[in-house]
Amino acid sequence: VGITGTTIKEIFMFNIKTAMFNLFFKFDLVSDLPGRMRLKVAHYKKLPKETQQYQQYGIQVIKRLDGIDKVTFNFVTGTVLIEYDKYKLTSSEILAYLDLIKKLVNDNMGLIRNLDGKSEKEIVDILFSVLDAYRSKHDFK
């Protein structure tokens, strides 16, 4: 236990989550059909296997954008399939939203680090509140 009461396991878990965010947001658009886009995660082979248990949060974050129907992570091929309502969204809007999420994470690393001691649910609620505020500020529905 360190000075702040943080255990090695907690630091390890935070580093896994941080690695997932930082590596996930380096992607290429490999397929772009109306209503369906596929992204290739650039460094997916470097993601620790433990990150797979957090994919539900990535899905929830992406699906907060109105018009996203389904998000599927494929950890074998390193792709993310996003199915969306082509009458509500364009792939450019989705990519802009993903950039907004990346900015949110990078701008709030201090906040994320200071969530030590909170339950997983509390952390998710806080981060989703911050995301919703960012979305409002940047005119995302």
Regions found by a protein language model. Give the residues of each.
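Long, charge-rich, low-complexity intrinsically disordered regions
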Residues: 2-9
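C-terminal low-complexity, charged extensions that often adopt amphipathic alpha-helices
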Residues: 9, 14-36, 47, 103-141
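Short amphipathic alpha-helix segments
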Residues: 12-19, 49-65
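Short acidic amphipathic segments
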Residues: 36-39, 46, 58-79, 83
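Acidic, Ser/Thr-rich low-complexity segments on the non-lumenal side of membrane proteins
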Residues: 40-41, 50
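Short amphipathic alpha-helices in soluble, non-transmembrane regions
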Residues: 54-58, 94-101
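Helix N-cap motif at beta-to-alpha junctions
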Residues: 84-89
